[in-house]
Amino acid sequence: LVNGGADVNAAGCEIHVKSTANPAAIFNAGTSIKAKKTCIQGSQIIKNGGTQTNLETACTTTSDPLAGKIPAPTSTACDYNNQNFSGNVTINPGVYCGWHNFNSGSNVTLKPGTYVIKDGGWNVNGGTWTGAGVTFYYADTSKIQFNSAVKATLSAPTSGAYKDILMAEKEGLSGSQFIFNDNLGFEMTGVLYLPSREVVFNSNSTARSYKMTAVMRKVIFNQTKWTITSYYAGSGSGTVSARLLK
């Protein structure tokens, strides 16, 4: 679902939508989707205006390039439970259980490694986030809730079990939402593998994603500006940047 004001610039990338629902996609007025190719498996879509470059319907979509390839963490035993953070904070990799609140204006530095999130989530209220060589793994329907006025620069590891993976989740989860609210800018490098999630980019969200592949159940753009370059081409031809499962 692409709502008014959304501007997605992925000129070197492909977007594949597996849905065969009626409609399989909705493009509302005042929107722009620029992609090397946007392939929608279903034949029924709603176009209320906007610009969609290289849009195809009833086409053959690519398979999930990462299905069954991302390992589960070696341990999901809790290391940290129900914390509150304020001010300048440096946090360590580990298993985070329950809800962890990052209060307004927190400046958060994440050390390299894997952050397993379970039985709750992280509630982020403003501030600056910096993390190189990090992976967020959701062991259940837990999430990170990015609220207003967050600025984040996050990149995936360049080696190891989670090489190139910025976000991943346990296989077979029931559907849930993952929301990026009004922010001051996200720069994300790596794969977002969230096949159970309805990912929502809300008003005035801005994101710049380098070397990215995104796999999501559904995506909703609300007045969002997102610039993407591709990461993972898989075993087939061409470059695949985003894949929607339903």
State what each model feature region is.
Residues 1-246:
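Compositional signature of intrinsically disordered, low-complexity segments enriched in polar residues
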